[in-house]
Regions:
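Aromatic-lined carbohydrate-binding/catalytic grooves of carbohydrate-active enzymes
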Residues: 27-123
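An acidic-aromatic substrate-binding cleft motif
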Residues: 1-17
């Protein structure tokens, strides 16, 4: 199936870089809805690099507890409740561009975690 337009949405990196947190993502999600962008076809809210802790726990990526105190599942649920899709960033290397843990050699466990958080799109 072909789409008439590419996937459209908002990505945290373009404006905020690593300066992201749960409240900001909720505010940007709300703005996509209130400004009519969601209804115009913008469907993704994508959290880019700097969402994770600097070390894995038991092989799992861990959301930064200071930035995302409710966790990614709760944030994904919030995004979905607004009629949007939840996107996240990872990398195919050992580390992301910022030097945080990425998915190389952890692809299956990371995919399961992303799915359990309700992630719809992986950048």
């Amino acid at each position: 199936m072909f789409r008439q337009t590419p996937p459209m949405g908002w990505n945290s990196w373009n404006t905020f870089g690593a300066n992201i947190n749960e409240q900001l993502i909720k505010e940007m999600t709300d703005a996509l809805v209130s400004t009519g962008l969601r209804d115009a076809g913008y469907e993704y809210v994508i959290i880019d690099d700097a969402w994770q802790e600097p070390r894995r726990e038991n092989g799992h990526l861990v959301p930064d507890r200071n930035k995302f105190p409710s966790g990614m599942k709760a944030l994904g649920d919030y995004i979905h409740s607004k009629g949007m899709k939840f996107g996240m960033y990872s990398s195919t290397g050992h580390l992301t561009c910022l030097g945080l843990p990425a998915s190389y050699e952890h692809e299956f466990i990371d995919a399961a975690d992303f799915a359990s958080w309700g992630v719809d799109y992986l950048k």
